[in-house]
Amino acid sequence: MLSFAASTRHVTRSQLLRAARRSYATESTSKKPSNLPLYLMGAGVAGLGTYFYLNSTGKSVITQEKSPLDPENFKDFKLKKIVPYNHNTSEFIFELPNNEASLLPVASCLVVRSSDPEALKDEKGKPIIRPYTPISPPEKQGELTLLIKKYDNGNASKHIHGLKEGDTLAIKGPIPKFPYKVNEFEEVALIGGGSGITPLYQIVTHALSNASNRTKFTLLFSNVTEADILLKSELEALQKKYPTKFNLVYMLDKPPAGWTGPTGYISKEVLQQHVAPASLNERVKVFVCGPPGQVAAVAGKKAGMKQGELGGILKELGYTEDQVYKF
């Protein structure tokens, strides 16, 4: 596994300047004051648009000058392989040209639409656009992997699940979300539900793969049944590899016989038991991602693309808006 500084793992300076003022549809992206400087620092260290990482010897290795993705325009990418994950979710592996890496900053997402804008529209006749967070690492060469759950009422997910190997999907990005910096926090809590695991997985794999990481992570991951747990083997492999840095807690609404973990909805008691206290102040960060109802209950509703006011159980427990981020 490669070890590299978080500040050198980003896209080019010009891409970030554009991405900071663009959204994935018609709205602007979140304008947190700290986001742009951190992203630009990563691009600036790399020089004039050159991406590099540090290998195990500490030597910088230049790999490519820019990401094959475009934060301003949709580009078609060929579907290389489909790997079924469970009864309603599959991994969609897209081919990146010239064996290039995506170079996505952490945390960020992509937005997708049909390669034929006329093929997937909403009731107002506008192309349907949806955000997804890749599960493949930014340095992965030649491939970009999306883990996508099929929803009966989700036209975008049904369209993607209808694709065949060799078809294309229009992708735009990256869309910067939270500029995660290794060792910025002592404790990080990741509260996720269902397919909301992907941005949380992006953060924890990025951090734990860095040999200098000292942050302790706790993932509280809720699902309906055990069969619904996405990335289960990957998460358990992380827990086994980093037992002192990663605590994994599953929570099920419909547990099997003999289940010993938490059950039902995420409660105040469960959060008090597993999440680092608000009294740690700037040393703790809580990331939340899941169905809108769950996010609202845990941390308050989002306001469109903006964070919205902090609410829910986390507010009751004394956390502040600076301590919580909602994907």
Indicate residue ranges for each PLM-predicted region:
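Short hydrophobic alpha-helical membrane-entry/anchor segments
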Residues: L48-Q64
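Ferredoxin-reductase
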Residues: T63-D167, N223-T225, D253-K254
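Reductase modules of NAD(P)H-dependent flavoproteins
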Residues: T26-K32, L36-Y53, L220-F327
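Structural motif
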Residues: E187-A189, K285
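Hydrophobic/small residue at the entry helix of a nucleotide-binding pocket
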Residues: S195-L200, Q294
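A short, basic/flexible loop-to-alpha-helix module at the beginning of a structural domain
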Residues: P174-E184
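Histidine-anchored nucleotide/phosphate-binding helix
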Residues: Y201-A211
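N-terminal mitochondrial targeting presequence
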Residues: M1-L36
